[in-house]
Amino acid sequence: MFLGNVNTFRKSLSKFKEIISQKYRREILCNLISNEITKLEEIDKKKIIRLLDYGSGYNTALIKKIIKKLSSKHKNTKFIADCYDNYSSKQLKLINNIQNIKFMHIKNLSNKHKARYNFCLIIDVLHHIGLEKNIKIHNIAKKLKKISKFLIIKDHFQYGFISNLTLIFMDFFSNYGEGTKIPKIYFNIKTFENFISKLKLKEIKRITDKKYYKWFWFYLNNEKFQFISILK
C-alpha cells in the first residue's frame, strides 16, 4: 500500500529491489492469480470481468500484467480493473493513462459504492495496514466482500520470533523505498483462520507451496512464509 512521497535514498532502494527481486516475484504472482481467475469463473461466457485491486500502490506493473495475460488468453472478454490506494491528485493524473485500468483514491470506495466485481485482489496489503487494528481490517474486508464475488488475498504467515523478524526485514527491503509502512506483526495460521471465520467467508483454496524469489534468497525464500487464499 503506497503512502506518500519518498526521498532520493528511498527511490534508489526501490530501483535496486526492483532489479534483484520484484520482477521475478511479479511474474510468479501474475501467473498464479491469472490461472486461479480462469479456474473460478466461466470467463469465455462473459463479456466483461471486473477486478478490484485494493491497496494497489504506485507501481502498476502487476495489475497491468494480469490484465494483459487474461486478455491474451480470453480474447472475447473485456477485463477491467479499478485500483484503490491513498493516491494524491497529482499521482492520479500521472497514472490514469492505462486502457481498462482506473486508479482512484481509497475514499472513493465508500459504503455507497455500487459497482460489483468478479474478483477483489488484496495483494500483500493487510499486514501493512496493521493486523493489530482488528476492527479496521475486519471492516475493510467486510466492505470488499459485499461488492466482490471472490476475494484473493496474498499475505504472509509468521511462526514465531525468528520468522517475524525475517518478514520485517523482507518488508523493509521491499517496501521502504516506496514509503510504505513497515508492519510489526503478521498473520499466523490460527489468526488468519479466525479472520476469515469472523467474516463468514468460505476458503476455496489456499496456496502455500510457491517460492516467489530466486534461489539466492535462501531462507528468505521459504515458501511457508507466503500464502494465497481464495475466498468466497
Map each language-model feature to its residues.
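Short conserved loop adjoining the S-adenosyl-L-methionine
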Residues: 110-114
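A short, conserved alpha-helix within the catalytic core of class I
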Residues: 129-144
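Class I SAM-dependent methyltransferase Rossmann-like catalytic core
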Residues: 1-41
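C-terminal alpha-helical "lid/dimerization" subdomain adjacent to the S-adenosyl-L-methionine
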Residues: 154-215
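Short catalytic micro-motifs in class I SAM-dependent methyltransferases
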Residues: 124-128
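A conserved beta-strand element that flanks and buttresses the S-adenosyl-L-methionine
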Residues: 121
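Core SAM-dependent methyltransferase catalytic element
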Residues: 214-232
